[in-house]
Curated annotation (Swiss-Prot):
Organism of origin: Drosophila melanogaster (Fruit fly)
Binding site for heme: 482
Family: Belongs to the cytochrome P450 family.
UniProt xrefs under SUPFAM superfamilies: Cytochrome P450 (SSF48264)
Lineage per the UniProt record: Eukaryota, Metazoa, Ecdysozoa, Arthropoda, Hexapoda
Annotated GO MF terms: heme binding; iron ion binding; monooxygenase activity; oxidoreductase activity, acting on paired donors, with incorporation or reduction of molecular oxygen
Protein name as annotated: Probable cytochrome P450 12a5, mitochondrial
Gene Ontology cellular-component annotations: mitochondrial membrane
Keywords, comma-separated and alphabetical: Heme, Iron, Membrane, Metal-binding, Mitochondrion, Monooxygenase, Oxidoreductase, Transit peptide
Cofactor: heme
Main location: mitochondrion
């Protein structure tokens, strides 16, 4: 036991020699001499009184045979910690990670977000940060991208890409291209479903991932990859699909599980670095293809007005490296996340046929025929579609929580928490709580409709909405809100509308433990959806 304690103390105190999350401390706009002496601060309890998990006990429960937390999924472990310590707990740092305060109190979420500063620090993505700031600094120096960067470098990059990615008019350019992708998705479903049962294979998640990568590539690379067609199965695109799958799989292991990669280069770290190199290599090839295409068009006298230029074209006008890194970030962050969200929506609609029927009524007005094209005007009139997407994100949230580094001293759950502390916000219990969402176990898109006419008199929508907006933030909040929000919303809206217009969707299997916790919540069951053709 003594040897174990000594080893644990060494592991806790030794500075990582490969990489540490604290090697790149966030820059803040906090006055260094700020001292709070207001009544709220003075009346709050000291930081030291926050319930604290003992590191030795935590290690034993998590890693040793018979430990209470051993083999638990992330959400199960968080629930167990909540039962043991309450709604706020301090978790000590370990194996190169910083300690953090974890809170389940939605009132704290607002405090944290209101005090995140102009350059919010979001912990995580350490492996990607290591790849870009250390291992491949020669390429990424000065342009680290949206996902791993912090401080001023993040702010500078975000200020470049925000006007391009967050403008609704720029997203609308992709209606026709997305429509083509979705038509191919529909045809592929018809090909792979069983002729007698109309069910797709249990590995349907791979098909969904192909659809999401195809969709995001239309924006990120200004190109359809052909992943939904027979001709695209042995292409460069297939390699990219494989590399991104490996990236997400290994990220979960290196970021979430106890690992020594921060102390020495483990075999998994080396494999991950090769994977990220491969993603970079393939992305560069596609960006170079786009540059050649644009140069050829310029020689031929093709000139597009500003409002018709693609996202990639606009970013290339700024800087090739900026365009390449942003494309990589969109690919790395835009596949599994959208796939999980889309899966959750399909499960909710399949298990609630009356909601699906109402959604189809709305979609039929937008798409009178199965092959009708989407228009900007028609897609403004789909409130129930947007409500279904939003409610599915509440029922099956994509992430367990969010985290920020405090930029000023703050009172969290009645305790004085100093600036520089990482606070992890866990809303998932509140999403299922009657206190915040009446009838929380029911899938009720009506709760998100803005007025009584939208809810068709079937449900007092205002009575079902949460009174605390910080409980439910599927795309984050503030300056660090998801930069791809509008793109993801477009993918989900167009893809869902096309499927519901073509198919009645059923899921005649259990949805128990439908998702498992990794970096995000991932589908955990065979997705044997039944797709029955809708009559014309």
């Amino acid at each position: 036991m003594l040897k174990g304690r000594i080893a644990l103390n060494i592991l806790q105190s030794q500075k990582p020699i490969v990489f540490s999350a604290s090697q790149q401390r966030w820059q803040t706009n906090v006055p260094t001499a700020e001292i709070r002496n207001d009544p709220e601060w003075l009346q709050a309890k000291p930081f030291e009184e926050i319930p604290k998990a003992n590191i030795l006990s935590l290690f034993a429960k998590s890693a040793l045979p018979g430990g209470k937390y051993k083999n638990l999924e992330m959400m199960e472990m968080i629930d167990a910690l909540r039962q043991d310590y309450g709604n706020i707990i301090f978790l000590p740092g370990m194996m190169g990670r910083d300690g953090l305060v974890m809170t389940h109190n939605p009132k704290d979420f607002e405090v944290v977000f209101r005090n995140e500063g102009v350059w919010p620090f979001r912990p995580g993505s350490d492996i990607l940060r290591y790849h870009r700031t250390v291992y491949r600094k020669d390429f990424f120096d000065g342009v680290q991208g949206i996902i791993p960067s912090q401080g001023k470098s993040w702010g500078d990059f975000r200020s470049i890409v925000n006007p391009v990615l967050m403008q609704p008019k720029n997203v609308r350019l992709y209606f026709k291209k997305m429509s083509q992708v979705n038509q191919e998705f529909v045809e592929l479903i018809k090909e792979i479903r069983d002729a007698s049962t109309q069910e797709v294979p249990g590995n349907f998640l791979e098909t969904i991932n192909r659809w999401t990568l195809e969709s995001v590539s239309v924006v990120a690379l200004d190109k359809q990859l052909g992943l939904l067609r027979e001709s695209g199965k042995n292409s460069e695109a297939t390699k990219l699909f494989k590399y991104l799958d490996e990236f997400f799989l290994h990220s979960a292991d290196l970021e979430m599980k106890p690992s020594l990669w921060r102390y020495f280069k483990t075999p998994l770290l080396k494999k991950m670095l090769r994977t990220m190199d491969s993603v970079q290599e393939v992305t560069l090839k596609y960006v170079d293809e786009a540059i050649e295409r644009l140069e050829k068009e310029a020689k031929e006298g093709v000139v597009r007005p500003e409002h018709e230029q693609s996202v990639l074209e606009k970013l290339l006008k700024v800087d090739k490296k900026v365009a390449t890194v942003m494309a990589m970030d969109m690919l790395m962050a835009g596949v599994d996340t959208t796939s999980s969200t889309f899966t959750a929506l399909l499960l909710c609609l399949a298990k609630n046929p009356e909601k699906q029927a109402r959604l189809r009524e709305e979609v039929m007005k937008v798409l009178p025929n199965k092959d009708s094209e989407f228009t900007e005007a028609s897609m403004k009139n789909v409130p129930y579609l947007r409500a279904c997407i939003k409610e599915s994100q509440r029922v099956y949230p994509l992430v367990i929580g969010n985290a920020r580094g405090l930029t000023r001293d703050s009172v969290i759950s009645g305790y004085r928490v100093p600036a520089g502390t990482i606070v992890s916000m866990i809303p998932i219990n509140s999403l299922y709580s009657e206190e915040y969402f009446p009838k929380p176990t029911e899938f009720l898109p009506e709760r998100w409709l803005r007025n009584a006419s939208d809810s068709a008199g079937k449900c007092p929508a205002n009575d079902l909405k949460t009174k605390n907006p910080f409980v439910f933030l599927p795309f984050g909040f503030g300056p660090r809100m998801c930069v791809g929000k509008r793109i993801v919303e477009m993918e989900l809206e167009l893809g869902t509308a096309r499927l519901i217009r073509n198919f009645n969707v059923e899921f005649n299997h259990s949805t128990k433990n439908a998702f498992r916790s990794a970096l995000i919540n991932l589908p955990n069951i065979p997705l044997k959806f039944k797709f029955t053709d809708v009559p014309n």
